[in-house]
């Protein structure tokens, strides 16, 4: 189930020398949105261990509104896979378009940074779709 994880406006300080948003800025927002999705289901630490290919379909400009939706699609022994979609709303036309998608993988870790089983850090009362992923 896709959920809104992050939404905001682009400001001049977010732009590269070409006048559009710096790609690394978008990736960092995607990582933050993914971490929010992860924190919704676990009570511990998790770290990003993999990001799939990211292809940008169009630039994002100053004043545009970005929307990042996430969906947890797979739960492993210690890993969580999240699909991430970035949409942009043009601040002039208010037209919404998809900018990029990617898949992020997080691993739950202990205080030393070693992976630990998800079962040991899952929050109570998980959404039904997460419960279904646990039984796969």
Locate the predicted segments by residue.
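HotDog/MaoC-like acyl-thioester-processing domains
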Residues: 4, 61-62, 73-136
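Short, well-ordered turn and helix-capping elements at secondary-structure junctions
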Residues: 10-14, 51-58, 88-90
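Hot-dog-fold acyl-thioester-processing enzymes
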Residues: 1-50, 107-136
